[in-house]
Amino acid sequence: MVYVLTAILILIGIVLLLRMKIHVALEYLHADDNDKLTLKITALFGLIRIKKTIPAIKVNKEDGTVDIKQKTESKMKKSSGKKKITQNDVQQSINKIEMLLHQVTRLRKISASFLAHLHITKLEWVTVIGIQDAAVTGVLTGAVWGVKGGIAAMLYDHLDFVNKPVYEVIPSFQVPVSKTHFQCIFFFRFGHAMLAAFKFVKYGRELSVLKKNPSARMTSKNDSSV
């Protein structure tokens, strides 16, 4: 009897864990030359709280220095010469292109299956932009509206919005300014995240097999078409 009750409690715990909601709040602030990114994660009915603030770029106008700056340099050797392209080289290039297309298709399917269970409770994106030339400010405002409209259409196709998102572009014709406030709050269930992670791991293993034997995908494809 004790073992049965223990098994039932464990089963209930697993079900509750898989159905647990994970809330994520993402906020990005841009004011002229300063940027700040804040990430908040809440789970287990608020018992688990994680907050991370990342000052992406901060420019000091007094001395012109940058507080956070990353620079990566690489040196490449230059070589000159002639190389003959054989039929084997062409076939390898074709296999690489096919593998790349296969990767993009699979990753898109996995991502789409997870994004379908992503629920957006709040999305707010406000931009204030302006320079000294009023005509150019108007053109920039229209361009920003176009970019936001394209992104909004793409998000509507892949995400579930609980509340209507807010998009705004405010032109400043008198004062030069560049400000952006982006805030996105969404939640998903732990079970859906685990399923997506499992699919990514499975895909990673399949990808390693394809890299070792590129013809394996073509063989499996031909077998499935028969």
Curated annotation (Swiss-Prot):
Species of provenance: Bacillus subtilis (strain 168)
Keywords: Signal
Domain of life: Bacteria
Protein name according to UniProt: Uncharacterized protein YtfI
Annotated InterPro entries: DUF2953 (IPR021338)
Gene this protein is translated from: ytfI
Leader sequence residues: 1-31
Pfam short name (any one): DUF2953
